[in-house]
From Swiss-Prot:
Residues involved in Fe cation binding: 307
Gene: PAP14
Pfam families: Metallophos
Binding positions (substrate): 197, 305-307
Protein name listed in UniProt: Probable inactive purple acid phosphatase 14
Keyword annotations from UniProtKB, A to Z: Glycoprotein, Iron, Metal-binding, Secreted, Signal, Zinc
Subunit structure: Homodimer.
Note on how the cofactor is bound: Binds 1 Fe cation per subunit.
GO cellular component labels: extracellular region; plasmodesma
Glycosylation sites: 79, 246, 266, 371, 384
Similarity comment: Belongs to the metallophosphoesterase superfamily. Purple acid phosphatase family.
Signal peptide span: 1-30
Cofactor(s) it depends on: Fe cation; Zn(2+)
Organism of provenance: Arabidopsis thaliana (Mouse-ear cress)
One example GO MF annotation: acid phosphatase activity
Length: 401
């Protein structure tokens, strides 16, 4: 009798899972079939490696910027490659995010496709899924942003998208706006649910509007509308049968150029990491941060662009974090090691001993120094606690980027 009951329960769970899978695929485009589904590991963890501002050029022929005189004769793009290989081997991430200025197209490379191949090679060779968005320097060549994203999308292990399948509904600006859904691990009742949502956005390069001069671009209304619609749909899916959840799954945003809110923090505010230059953000605040606060889903926004800033600071429940510059061809600071940012989400255990929803999100940085130092471990968010907000302001002179 007990064995019959056990088989019935197992059969019911499998049937529910299969029905949910069939229902879920109604919202999946043909583009998504055949692509690797991201999910938490059986240890309840999911780790993301963020690499920003490689500014990759010709490989060994490209000289380094802002290194010591002793290092300069032997330093090239290959130092960036070595750093990434070293970090991938140490951290073993589940996903690698290249957050813009991956190559330096401005009169620096005659073959931008070859530069991208070299820049992304450590991720490709690792076999680990990876994605990329563009910065303001990537397309400064004979290749458009759209063409670059189409090229990146087709590289091995890449989960990048040119734009979401429903982009036409929003007449979405830019190229490289997409969502990644991280589902529960094998054996979890949340196996078919997205329990961590990633939003990657194209923050553009330079505005083309009259009256602004040569200023940085911003996240447009069309992109914000797409984010809001996607976020609401994911919330509905998260709370629907089977195994409906009471809360919204946490989200993370990656974009290259920092939002104006990053400038609200200076050295005197409570932050983890350092500010060593001004925030170079758009001249227009398009309201994207307000949209994120209103939705209440996103727990962290991760940017690059300002190479020698690497801090995280919290504002209205959202952590604003710099990656720090990873590339040796891009500007840096002598004696200040190139670096990358790691984010790790950890699941909670249910009362039945199964993996449940995301419990904590933490971050740290890896340096390309002698010891491959791990620094500034920080809890960004925990499910049961609201962190105190920080406020600040900086209005120092903006340097050239």
């Amino acid at each position: 009798m007990e064995e019959t009951r056990r088989r019935f329960v197992i059969s019911s769970v499998l049937s529910v899972s299969l029905i949910y899978l069939c229902l879920s695929t109604c919202h999946v485009s043909a583009f998504d079939f055949g692509r690797r589904q991201l999910r938490f590991n059986t240890d309840g963890r999911f780790k993301i490696l963020q690499v920003s501002d490689m500014h990759y050029g010709f490989g060994k022929e490209t000289q380094c910027s802002d290194v010591s005189p002793a290092e300069f004769p032997y330093c090239s793009d290959l130092n960036t490659t070595s750093f990434l290989q070293r970090t991938i081997a140490s951290e073993k991430p589940d996903l690698i995010v290249f957050s813009g200025d991956n190559v330096y197209g401005l009169c620096e490379t005659s073959d931008v496709a070859k530069s991208m191949d070299m820049a992304f090679a450590p991720a490709i060779e690792s076999g680990i899924p990876w994605v990329a968005i563009l910065g303001n320097h990537d397309q400064e060549s004979d290749m458009t942003r759209e063409t670059m994203m189409k090229y990146i999308m087709k590289l091995p292990n890449s989960l990048s998208q040119v734009n979401p399948p429903d982009a036409w509904l929003y007449q979405i600006d830019g190229f490289g706006n997409y969502n990644l859904q991280i589902e529960g691990p094998f054996g979890s009742p949340l196996f078919f649910k997205s329990i961590l949502n990633l939003y990657l956005l194209d923050g553009g390069s330079y505005t083309k509007l009259d009256g602004f001069g040569y200023k940085y671009d911003w996240v447009k209304t069309s992109q914000q509308n797409w984010y809001e619609h996607t976020s609401k749909w994911l919330e509905m899916e998260h709370k629907r049968w089977p195994f409906p959840q009471n809360s919204t799954a946490p989200g993370l945003v990656y974009l290259h150029i920092p939002m104006p809110e990053f400038a609200l923090f200076n050295k005197s505010t409570e932050m983890t990491g350092v500010r060593q230059e001004s925030t170079c953000s758009p001249p227009i605040n398009s309201g994207f941060f307000t949209k994120l606060v209103e939705r209440g889903e996103v727990k962290g926004v991760f940017s690059g662009h300002d190479h020698v800033n690497d801090f995280c600071a919290e504002l209205h429940g959202i952590n604003l974090c710099y990656a720090g510059g990873a590339g040796y061809h891009g500007y840096g600071q002598v004696g200040w090691a190139r670096r990358v940012r790691v984010v790790e989400a950890q699941l909670e255990k249910t009362m039945y001993g199964r993996w449940g929803a995301v419990d904590t999100i933490k971050t740290w940085k890896r340096l390309d120094d002698k010891n491959h130092s791990l620094i500034d471990t920080q809890l960004l968010w925990t499910k049961n606690t609201t962190l105190e907000p920080n406020f600040g302001f900086s209005c120092s002179t903006i340097p050239q980027h």
